Amino acid sequence: MNNLEIFKESEKYMPGGVNSPVRAFSNASINPPIIKKGLGSRIVDEEGKEYIDFVASWGPMILGHNDPEVVEAIQNTVEDAISFGAPTELELKLAKHMVETLDNIDMVRMVNSGTEATMSAIKLARGYTRRDRIIKFAGCYHGHFDGFLVEAGSGVLTERIPGSPGVPKGSIENTLIAEYNHIDTVEALFEKYPEEIAAIIIEPIAGNMGTIPAKTEFLQRLREICTKYGALLIFDEVMTGFRVAYKGAQSRYGVKPDLTTYAKIMGGGLPSGAYGGRRDIMEKLSPIGPVYQAGTMSGNPVVMAAGYTTLRKLYNNPSYYEHMEKIGAELQKGIEIVAKEKGLPVVVNRCGAMLTPFFSKRDKVADYEDAKSSDTELYGRFFEHMIKSGIYIAPSQFEAMFIGVKHDIYEVERFLEAMRKF
């Protein structure tokens, strides 16, 4: 079957033909290619068409598709283990590596996704502080947990859904919304609820309303406010962890969170997640503390092997980050030059190996309101043109593009060549 036939058949058995909404290309007039295989920075669909991949499975594939060392680790592990639901040495290896190589992580708990990591971190923060309210930021996406689906980014923003049916009012009544990069909105909430807020959760570099870095002074003030009021500061580094730097966004800003969540890259391409932080907080988790959180597949040996191999390879090769910074800078510069040549209203935000070209007439895109002003119709046409040109980018204006270790200058030139023909 060709791409269209497979997709139409899939629609009979899966809602929208997909298992995650953004994959359906519902905001575009083309159907998604059905991907068959990948190698390095390239993916190939069922019809044999090759694409330069700047989606990277929405971030995880930083080493490229089918990295030989990761594949070998997976193959060696499955010969002896697929799942036990019991302790293994592999989970110790990954946990120890993370604690020893990351800042601000004294202990870590493995889970199976970014959503699990963030919802578990919130539960832990509430249990530790004995408070119920949390603060999240408009446009930040922390997974599909009920309490987060308020003013969320990612697919919720792409689909223009104000929230989501099926989320009871009671699930979100303790979720307070502040404005990203606007500290006065945070201060006002703490003044109103000085002893009720358990935590602030934030993407230090937002990636789900497009790439929007937090201002350094903004994060510093969040740290000060949390310390003052006895609330916890949670950095959602599901996307930025091991990507914008090995030690994540917090290492670029020099701001210390109490808890950090991870996923995507840390699983080497397999379903993964983790949260960690201060020992006194993490020791509140069951079985040594009162906060209960569990998972049948948590610490799965195959995932642990892939994750351990990936993180060790990234940690032992700092030149990878130098390379991705170089490629990212060249791509950003090139997009800006071509946009100017063609009279396209484009603002490029980039932090290391993630970037977003916003089709916006504003001078800068620094917050949620700026992001929402983007010309999504124009971006949609650009997306369709690039896909047809063999450049695989996100169908949504509000998702990031990802640079990987295997991307090179030639692929930057291919991207820019395609853009010039738009």
Swiss-Prot record:
Its cofactor is pyridoxal 5'-phosphate. It is found in: Cytoplasm. One of its GO terms (biological process) is protoporphyrinogen IX biosynthetic process. The keyword Nucleus does not apply. Its main location: cytoplasm. Keywords: Cytoplasm, Isomerase, Porphyrin biosynthesis, Pyridoxal phosphate. It holds the Pfam family Aminotran_3. Gene3D superfamilies: Aspartate Aminotransferase, domain 1, Type I PLP-dependent aspartate aminotransferase-like (Major domain). It catalyses: (S)-4-amino-5-oxopentanoate = 5-aminolevulinate. GO terms for cellular component: cytoplasm. Its EC number is 5.4.3.8. GO terms for molecular function: glutamate-1-semialdehyde 2,1-aminomutase activity; pyridoxal phosphate binding; transaminase activity. The modification N6-(pyridoxal phosphate)lysine is found at residue 264. Pathway: Porphyrin-containing compound metabolism; protoporphyrin-IX biosynthesis; 5-aminolevulinate from L-glutamyl-tRNA(Glu): step 2/2. It is an enzyme of class 5 (isomerase). Homodimer. Belongs to the class-III pyridoxal-phosphate-dependent aminotransferase family. HemL subfamily. HAMAP family: HemL_aminotrans_3. This is Glutamate-1-semialdehyde 2,1-aminomutase. It comes from Clostridium tetani (strain Massachusetts / E88). The lineage of its organism: Bacteria, Bacillati, Bacillota, Clostridia, Eubacteriales.
